[in-house]
Amino acid sequence: MKISARRIKTATILDVSGNIDMSNSPEVRKALLQEIRVKGVTRVALNLSAVNYIDSSGVASLVEGLKASRDLGSRFVLFGLNDSAREVLKISRLLKLFEVYDDEIQAMASLAPSV
């Protein structure tokens, strides 16, 4: 699994590739919390378009990122979920907790500051 961060205007996109499972979900959690809590980024989008598989520990990392963002009044969105990842979130009844977008354009539009 690989994680990289890039800044687009007022938001940070974390690009994740590979599987998110028990062996590496702490890395995802750390990257999310680094952006939200340490760097104070108020708009974070997690790009899951290159993620093949996510297990319950990966879902827990996403929930922790969501909780941290809500605690600090930040926005945290997901985009690019494949059918498998979407189904994992749906079965766990967590899909409705997240703002989920099909692609980066939609996610960035949702995070754009209102004028």
Please place each PLM-identified region on the residue numbering.
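Short low-complexity stretches enriched in small and charged residues
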Residues: 1-5, 33, 55, 108
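A charged, well-structured terminal subsegment
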Residues: 100-115
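Conserved catalytic submotifs in the C-terminal HATPase_c
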Residues: 8, 49, 105
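General small-molecule cofactor/ligand-binding pocket signal
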Residues: 4-6, 79, 101
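Amphipathic alpha-helical interaction surfaces in cytosolic regulatory modules
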Residues: 22-98
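Short beta-strand/loop segment at the start of cytosolic alpha/beta domains
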Residues: 1-15
